[in-house]
Every structure is written in C-alpha cells, then in structure tokens.
Amino acid sequence: MGQTLSEPVLDKHSSSGGDRWLHFGVSHMQGWRISMEDAHCALLNFTDSNSSNPPTSFFGVFDGHGGDRVAKYCRQHLPDIIKSQPSFWKGNYDEALKSGFLAADNALMQDRDMQEDPSGCTATTALIVDHQVIYCANAGDSRTVLGRKGTAEPLSFDHKPNNDVEKARITAAGGFIDFGRVNGSLALSRAIGDFEYKKDSSLPPEKQIVTAFPDVVIHNIDPDDEFLILACDGIWDCKSSQQVVEFVRRGIVARQSLEVICENLMDRCIASNSESCGIGCDNMTICIVAFLHGRGLEDWYNWITQRVNSGEGPCAPPSYAELRGPNTIADARNLQLEYDHIASHEYGSGDTYDSDSDDETIAYDRYYLH
C-alpha cells in the first residue's frame, strides 16, 4: 500500500468539456497517499477535423506506482504515440492501441533516465471513433465501465497476478506469485514501466513477467448507452462497478455536473482513517463521459432523469446525491473476497473482444461485474 499521511489531502482538481456528441467531467484527489501518482487525459478532438479519418476522441486514466514519472509520460505522450502508428490511419484501431502501448513502453525503456526508475503505471483508455464505436484498451487494474440504462457493463479486465492467464505468463517467464503479488511485490500483472520485470531479452514484450500489452474491447455505441466511466483502483477497491453506475445516475438526476459527481464519489470513497488496510487510502481519479446521442446537455440530463423516474434501470437512493464522507469499509467488505474467488477466464493475453457478443458479455458479467 505504501506510506500514508497523518491527514488526507482532500483538495480536488477537476475539469470538464464537451461538444455536440460527448460531454465529460474528470477529477482527481491525492487522498491519504504521500504524493499524487495518478494522471489522466481527455481529448475530445483527438484527430484533426480536416483528417480523412473519422473524428475520434480519447480518454485515459493512468494509475502510477513507485513514482509518478511513467504516469505523467503516458498522459503527455501515449495519445500521440498511438496516433503515430500506421495502423491508426488505416482504421485498424485495435492494432494501433496494442502497438501504441508497446511503443510507449519501449520508448521509456530506451530512455536512460528511466532505465533505473522503479515506477510504472496502469493504463485504461477509451478511443471513441466517429461517435459510434468505443475501443477500450487496458493494461493493469484500472477499469473502464459502461453505464447502460443503469446497468454496469465492463469494457476492461482487471489484470491481477492470480488470474490463470496472467499466472501462466508470469511463471513461464521465470516469475512467481507470492501473496497475490508478482515476485511478492507488484499487485498487478500488466503495466507500462516496471522494467525490472521486463529484462528477459529472449522474450517478446507480450511474454515478459509483466507486460504493457493491453486487452482491447470493442463496443458499438447503442442508443441505450448513457455514459462511460474510467477510474483507477482507488475507486474500484471501494465501490463495485454497479454501485458507481448507480451513484452517477443519482447525481445526474440531482442535476449535478459530471465533475461534481466525480468529486462526490471520491468523498464517498475516502477512508475516515488510514487503518483500513489500504481501502480508501489510495490516490483517486475518475472520468465520466456522457453519450449525448445528438441531444443538448440539458436534454441528456432530462432523458436520464425520465428513465430513472419511470423505473428504467437501477439508481442509487436520492440521499446519495447529498451524501458525503467515507463509507468504504461497508461497501468494500466483500470485494476482496470476491476477487479471491474469481474463476479463471478463458481469454489469452492481448485479445480483442466484441462486447456485443452474447457469450462474451455473459462471460464478462460472470467474471468481472461485481
């Protein structure tokens, strides 16, 4: 978990933006940690409007560990590295994301200043193409979740060392798992950076003990899709995917801006003290992206409010819109037990999935949706 402060830093840094198709709010908070190691990006106009390619937007959350340098590098450079991949301009976006993650990792590895740096970061990103398709690339245990009519649908996998596919790669590369950690140290099994786990020159990047190679989930945006949530495990360790979707919905009904909903959720997750085994003591970052479906922002709020009022999908109780303060232990009590008993999944490293496949959706829900 790392060292904690005697009092949490509760100052929040928030921003928002939008166009006729999307609107986002994002916020981050240092919390109990001695430094802020998270980073994020929100790029509505990812590709030039004069480009021959369709319009794209890009969102990412990067949860650093062992320092903030890799997370900050990803915020500044990963989007452009992805966009520089030849496959991006050919419309092969899933390949561009995979090669872009590895290219960013390699660029850091070749940087002399970074070769001895112990830091690394997760990366959960959403590339939205032509307002119609989401390409979600993920490496690590940050998470991207879709809110569809009040139901949480996972668009990423949490890469934990005890997952069977991850464990097989780790041990094949000469690593081991102790107390649920890679070589007894790292609590996640994929990351950008963490070069001490990537030293076997006989293995390709995707076969190293820890790899930056992402899984990519492709989702065709549906008229029922309401919003997208990207967040670090500082949120997901405290709240399930479904709890967060319902919390966001309640904030929308209360006419709170998306960045204020982010701020309120972090207030809800922060631990009342630093003795909670790390739950609620981490840095926190959350980004909410609204799918306007051609509506104005006010009409989008009205649309979801009407759905909630007519009973279309679950929503947190009205009191949650005004609720402040820590409640992490009650909500998180069963999350770790749930992770400990997760069944192994059948997918291989760096696979691409179509989230509209019924079989895969069922598998996602069974495996990842708490």
UniProtKB/Swiss-Prot annotation:
Q: Give the subcellular location.
A: Nucleus; Cytoplasm, Cytosol
Needs which cofactor?
Mg(2+); Mn(2+)
Q: What is this protein called?
A: Protein phosphatase 2C homolog 2
**What does the UniProt cofactor note say?**
Binds 2 magnesium or manganese ions per subunit.
EC number, UniProt record: 3.1.3.16
Annotated Gene Ontology cellular component terms: cytosol; nucleus
- What S-S linkages are listed for this chain? none
Main localisation, per the record? Answer: nucleus
Q: Which gene encodes it?
A: ptc2
Organism in which the protein naturally occurs: Schizosaccharomyces pombe (strain 972 / ATCC 24843)
**Record carries keyword Repeat:** no
| Positions annotated to bind Mn(2+) 1 | D63, G64
Note the superkingdom of the native organism. Eukaryota
Residues found modified as Phosphoserine: S355, S357
Positions of the PPM-type phosphatase domain: 23-291
What terms describe the molecular function in GO for this protein?
metal ion binding; protein serine/threonine phosphatase activity
